[in-house]
Every structure is written in C-alpha cells, then in structure tokens.
C-alpha cells in the first residue's frame, strides 16, 4: 500500500476504493494542504439508482468525512443524449418529463450519505441541464469541439466495442463524451471543482475532461476511479433473478435489500464491510476473520449496517428481525414483502407461475419452471411440484395470506384485496 499524506486518499485506499488516478502525487499534495472539491455524475435513466452506484456514492461520503466538498451532479442534460459506456445498443431516448421525474425520484438517495447545506464542506447538488441546454451549437463546436480528436475518440472502449461488433453508434451518443468533459470544465469554473470520481468504466470520459480543462485554461484537474463492483467469483454485482438491486424502497423492499447483503459470498464479506458500511476498520477486521458458520454473523452485520445507511437504523433492524422470525422461528412475519391479489382472481384460480413472476421472485415463467424442477419454489413452505398448479382461497394460511418462497431466503406474502 502507498503511504499517502492526505486522510482522503489514505481512507479510500484502506477501504478498497481506489482503482486509477491521473496523478496520485499531485492529488495527494492538493488534498493534504487544501480542500478538494470533487464531483460524480449520475444520469437520470431510471426512477432509482442501483447498487452499482453505491461505490461512487460512498467515495463521496468519505470525501466529505475527511473534510472535503462533494458535488452530486444530476445528469438532466446528458440523460437527453445517453451514455454509450458499457452498452451494446443505443439507449432509449427518454422524454424530458420522464427525465425530470427520474431526477426527483433519485435525489433523496444522496441525503442518506451526504450532508447538504451552505457550510465549507457541505455537499452541493446541481444539474448539468443548467448549462448544457443553453449551449449555442456553433460556439460549442468552436470553443470545445475543436479540442477533441476523432482519432482518439475512436479508440475509446465505449466506441471501439460498438464499431468492432458492427453495431450502430449514433452521432448523439458519440457526443456524450464531449458533454461529460465539458461538465467538468463548467464545474471547475462555477465551484472550483478539481476532481472527478467515478467507476473504472468512466476512466476515458473523465480523463478527457482533465485534458479539456488543461486546453481551456482551468486550474489543474484530476481523475480518480473506483473498481467495478464484482463478486469474488467474478460475477457482476447489482442483479438478482428478479432484476436490479434498486436503492429506492418503492422499487425494492427494504427486506429484500437486507437479504441481498445477507446472501453475499463468504469471500466477499470483509471487502464489502469496508466498502458499504462505515464500521471502524478494527471491527471489520474482527468480523472478516470469522470462519465456518460464524461468517453468517458477519453477513448479518453487513446486511444491517448497509441497510441502515440507506434506509435508516429502524428499518434495518426491522428487516433483521423479520429474517430472524422467518428463518429461526419458522413463523410468518408481517414485515415480509407483500403483494396484493384481487380476491376474484384467487377465487377463480391463479396460476402459480404468473404469481411468482408478479411477486418478483423469478424473472419469467421459464425461470419459474426451471426452479420448480430443482425444487426451488414453495407455497406455504411446501415445494411446488406441478407448474400448472393454481392457487385458490384454500391455500390461505390462518393469517389470511399465501407465502411464496424461492430458496430459503426469499419470500413474498400474497394478500387478498
């Protein structure tokens, strides 16, 4: 490990956030003598951010905790274009109303991790639509576009991958990297920003911003990326059988979020405690050292602490209690995720495949059939043996619900409405 002078870089390194930096020595010197103002951008492509965004959010959290100033940049402008990074097809163009609605929906996530206000190191939230929508096209070409080499842009991974696969790359997407670079320059001018952080897939775009700042005469700018989120087995994190692990409780119940962290691989527990909780490093070391069945206790701590950061301590403890009631006592907890089903639908017989899909426990009827063959789906703790099974009021428990389960840890209660 490198011995940095600044608390900021030492903290990020100790907890495993650092992947690449444009100039470690220069950034460390700056952070050790002055306040760093850093930003991370978030496009508004969905009503919620997901677990994949957490690394960069936690980087901003530790930036602020070490006395520096974070900027959460909403991509109200860039979302109108669409980031081609990591995409093998053109993003769907969203309406302006949908982008605005998504932006409002994700704003609250940052309030859980950052302190906003007018203080010296209080966080700022801004939207690149403020300047991107006011740009004059001809002036943009003359003042900004002339600094970009098509030759270099064609070597960017996001562009090269699409071209090599002979997949269409629209002109509007090709311009995304120019807009992101300009964001950096604009934030440097408006807020004295001197660092952009993001995932390693954004490295090329961020470095382009550093270079554009130099060419346009801003102060020295820096780039810092975190690794992409993967499990110890190399699988990309952030997805379950039911879809993305959303951060908004309206899109993923708190209990499911808790269970996501409870179910991580044993080898990932120590690393994820460093990245996704604010527990002291000494306590993390003790938890990471647990072996055998004891590692499950560390997983419960990870799940509760990660959930508490996002949804609050009370909700995290409630999720932990629900898991304890469900698994250790074998009871049906009222805190399990619920799905209302019309009484008329149940009375006429509801197909089990469609109900498991509707409950979010599987992604499709085909997956439900595969799970049934493997004994993975249960109704009221009894394995489903027939994919043509229908549920009726006869399946209601004394509590007036039907318990759907996939595996041992994922449950949804059907409640007649």
UniProtKB/Swiss-Prot annotation:
One of its GO terms (molecular function) is RNA binding. SUPFAM superfamilies: Alpha-L RNA-binding motif, Nucleotidylyl transferase. One of its GO terms (biological process) is tyrosyl-tRNA aminoacylation. Residues 350-417 form the S4 RNA-binding domain. The keyword ATP-binding applies. Keywords: Aminoacyl-tRNA synthetase, ATP-binding, Cytoplasm, Ligase, Nucleotide-binding, Protein biosynthesis, RNA-binding. Its EC number is 6.1.1.1. A motif ('KMSKS' region) lies at residues 236-240. It comes from the Bacteria. Pfam families: SYY_C-terminal, tRNA-synt_1b. InterPro entries: aa-tRNA-synth_Ic (IPR002305), Rossmann-like_a/b/a_fold (IPR014729), S4_RNA-bd_sf (IPR036986), SYY-like_C (IPR054608), Tyr-tRNA-ligase (IPR002307), Tyr-tRNA-ligase_bac-type (IPR024088), Tyr-tRNA-ligase_bac_1 (IPR024107). GO terms for cellular component: cytosol. It is found in: Cytoplasm. ATP binds at residue 239. Its main location: cytoplasm. It catalyses: tRNA(Tyr) + L-tyrosine + ATP = L-tyrosyl-tRNA(Tyr) + AMP + diphosphate + H(+). A motif ('HIGH' region) lies at residues 44-53. L-tyrosine binds at residues 39, 176, 180. Catalyzes the attachment of tyrosine to tRNA(Tyr) in a two-step reaction: tyrosine is first activated by ATP to form Tyr-AMP and then transferred to the acceptor end of tRNA(Tyr). Belongs to the class-I aminoacyl-tRNA synthetase family. TyrS type 1 subfamily. Homodimer. This is Tyrosine--tRNA ligase.
């Amino acid at each position: 490990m490198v011995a940095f002078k600044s608390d900021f870089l030492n903290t990020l390194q100790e907890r495993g956030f650092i992947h690449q930096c444009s100039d470690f020595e220069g950034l460390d010197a700056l952070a050790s003598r002055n306040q760093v103002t850093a930003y991370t951008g978030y496009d508004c492509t969905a009503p919620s951010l997901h677990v994949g965004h957490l690394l960069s959010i936690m980087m901003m959290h530790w930036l602020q905790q070490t006395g520096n100033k974070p900027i959460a940049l909403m991509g109200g402008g860039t979302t109108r274009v669409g980031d081609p990074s990591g995409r093998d097809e053109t993003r769907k163009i969203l309406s302006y109303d949908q982008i605005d609605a998504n932006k409002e929906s994700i704003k609250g996530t940052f309030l859980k991790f950052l302190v906003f206000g007018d203080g010296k190191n209080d966080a700022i939230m801004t939207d690149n639509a403020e300047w991107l929508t006011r740009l004059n096209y001809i002036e943009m070409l003359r003042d900004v576009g002339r600094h970009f080499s098509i030759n270099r842009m064609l070597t960017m991974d996001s562009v090269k991958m699409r071209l090599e696969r002979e997949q269409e790359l629209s002109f509007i997407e090709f311009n995304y990297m120019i807009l992101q670079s300009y964001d950096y320059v604009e934030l440097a001018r408006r807020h004295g920003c001197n660092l952009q952080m993001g995932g390693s897939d954004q490295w090329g775009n961020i470095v382009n911003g550093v270079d554009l700042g130099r060419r346009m005469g801003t102060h020295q700018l820096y780039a810092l990326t975190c690794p992409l989120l993967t499990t110890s087995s190399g699988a990309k994190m952030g997805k379950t059988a039911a879809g993305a692990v959303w951060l908004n409780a309206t899109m993923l119940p708190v209990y499911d979020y808790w269970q996501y962290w409870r179910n991580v691989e044993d080898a990932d527990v120590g690393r994820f405690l460093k990245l996704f909780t604010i527990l002291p490093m000494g306590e993390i070391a003790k938890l990471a050292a647990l072996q055998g069945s004891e590692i499950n206790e560390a997983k419960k701590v990870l799940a509760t602490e990660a959930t508490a950061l996002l949804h609050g301590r009370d909700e995290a403890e409630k999720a932990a209690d629900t898991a304890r009631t469900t698994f250790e006592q074998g009871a049906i907890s009222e805190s399990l995720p619920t799905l209302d089903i019309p009484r008329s639908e149940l009375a006429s017989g509801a197909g089990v495949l469609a109900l498991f899909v509707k409950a979010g426990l599987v992604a499709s009827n085909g997956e439900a059939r595969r799970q049934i063959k493997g004994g993975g789906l249960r109704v009221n703790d009894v394995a489903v043996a027939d994919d043509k099974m229908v549920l009726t009021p006869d399946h209601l428990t004394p509590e007036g619900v039907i318990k759907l389960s996939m595996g041992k840890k994922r449950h949804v209660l059907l409640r007649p409405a």
